[in-house]
Amino acid sequence: MTATVNEAPASTSKGATGRIARVIGPVVDVEFSADTMPDQNNALTTQVTMGGTTQTVTLEVASHLGDNMVRAISLKPTDGMVRGAAVVDTGAPISVPVGNATLGHVFNAIGECLNLEEGEQLEVHERWPIHRKAPNFDQLESRTTMFETGIKVIDLLTPYVQGGKIGLFGGAGVGKTVLIQEMIQRVAQNHGGVSVFAGVGERTREGNDLIGEMAEAGVFDKTALVFGQMDEPPGTRLRVALSALTMAEYFRDVQNQDVLLFIDNIFRFTQAGSEVSTLLGRMPSAVGYQPTLADEMGVLQERITSTRGHSITSLQAIYVPADDYTDPAPATTFAHLDATTELSREIASRGLYPAVDPLTSTSRILDPLYIAQDHYDTAVRVKQILQRNKELQDIIAILGVDELSEEDKLTVSRARRIQQFLSQNTYMAEKFTGVEGSTVPLKETIEGFSKIADGELDHVAEQAFFNVGGLEDVERNWARIQKETA
């Protein structure tokens, strides 16, 4: 049961009362008088009684049907809703609490706090509507500062931008949510500041695990969490990202903070939009997606941006259906991102985590204009070695390694060491592997890969590079291996 929230009075007066004319799943048609029709995106409320308990259900106006009828999408289950029931127009869009009061609390898409003790009250002094305009063009500020994570494969080959949008792409079970949780842990340790997490259509168990891990790490009190899980109606899953983003915008625009916004999973946002579009009777577009896919994605992504002096840095997990990157959902998201981290099932199957594909992952600041020359040169050399190794795999599969030239044998040998060294022991995996997590400074990352590419570590066995932090760990492993084989 949701605890009582003590809020400041809304600035808008409530509108008129209508009547429910039809209920079809989460779609509710409501009739108003001609002079009291609610605006598009207005929040409507109705009382539903089931099992002796009465609860308030929020609806959002999605379209005007004519004949004084509006079609609304329910943000809660419609069980118990009946024709003829009264519906009140709130006169305003859905709004959510903003400010410091949100930190250390869990909310749903309509701003109800879910983790208060019975009888506890949350003092909310301000609420913002979730439908807002993106910042004006003259307020935007382009950022090119690198956001160091301490994860070797990311910092070297797909450097993140402070104030940028970062996408973690991957199919089912390759490590998107674990990597998001890892980033939350690292950001709290190394960067501080305020974070907002949006759980969009993901598993309730994962949300519960995340809250527990954040509490253990001591970062829960600096984070606002907004959840619309996969068992909730599509209207909730479609709006929860906007609710979380609104909270993040307040910290950016009013408190002038640099904010971190985590969204897991953007695909579920698209999927919810497709469900709502079908419920509203719109003609589907490519692969069954909604015809407004690009517009809906743009409305969300254009608000996630940096303004003069302040930024929202977002990490977005993006599920790739059937590992098909040409699917319209992930393809539409690509255009909005500053860095893309693609997680590979083939790399994950070899037990190399994080399973980042070094050849397909990209970043707009992987350029000597924005990063140090030695960083750029090392990244290019590493990619060249890995690309050449990939080209040689067919020859190796047919003829074997012995048929390669001496130069190609060296390339393959170094590529294998690089692949092993790209894996890293993470904090989130400590409880599974028993290996302590590590944060590797960028300087050490560049030095390590440069030495491998130069052949300075050709004498070290491949297994010494597996699941380690920096070169010190490699040397320690190599000494242990030599001792065991002596």
Swiss-Prot record:
Gene: atpD
CDD domains for this protein: ATP-synt_F1_beta_C, ATP-synt_F1_beta_N, F1-ATPase_beta_CD
Subunit structure: F-type ATPases have 2 components, CF(1) - the catalytic core - and CF(0) - the membrane proton channel. CF(1) has five subunits: alpha(3), beta(3), gamma(1), delta(1), epsilon(1). CF(0) has three main subunits: a(1), b(2) and c(9-12). The alpha and beta chains form an alternating ring which encloses part of the gamma chain. CF(1) is attached to CF(0) by a central stalk formed by the gamma and epsilon chains, while a peripheral stalk is formed by the delta and b chains.
InterPro entries: AAA+_ATPase (IPR003593), ATP-synt_VA_C (IPR055190), ATP_synth_F1_bsu (IPR005722), ATPase_a/bsu_AS (IPR020003), ATPase_alpha/beta_chains (IPR050053), ATPase_F1/V1/A1_a/bsu_N (IPR004100), ATPase_F1/V1/A1_a/bsu_N_sf (IPR036121), ATPase_F1/V1/A1_a/bsu_nucl-bd (IPR000194)
Name this polypeptide is given: ATP synthase subunit beta
Subcellular location: Cell membrane
Any Gene Ontology CC annotation: proton-transporting ATP synthase complex
Keyword Disulfide bond (UniProt): no
Membrane topology field: Peripheral membrane protein
Protein family: Belongs to the ATPase alpha/beta chains family.
Superkingdom as given in the UniProt entry: Bacteria
Taxonomic placement: Bacteria, Bacillati, Actinomycetota, Actinomycetes, Kineosporiales
The entry's keywords: ATP synthesis, ATP-binding, Cell membrane, CF(1), Hydrogen ion transport, Ion transport, Membrane, Nucleotide-binding, Translocase, Transport
Reported function: Produces ATP from ADP in the presence of a proton gradient across the membrane. The catalytic sites are hosted primarily by the beta subunits.
E.C. no: 7.1.2.2
Binding, ATP: 170-177
Catalytic activity: ATP + H2O + 4 H(+)(in) = ADP + phosphate + 5 H(+)(out)
Entry GO MF terms: ATP binding; ATP hydrolysis activity; proton-transporting ATP synthase activity, rotational mechanism
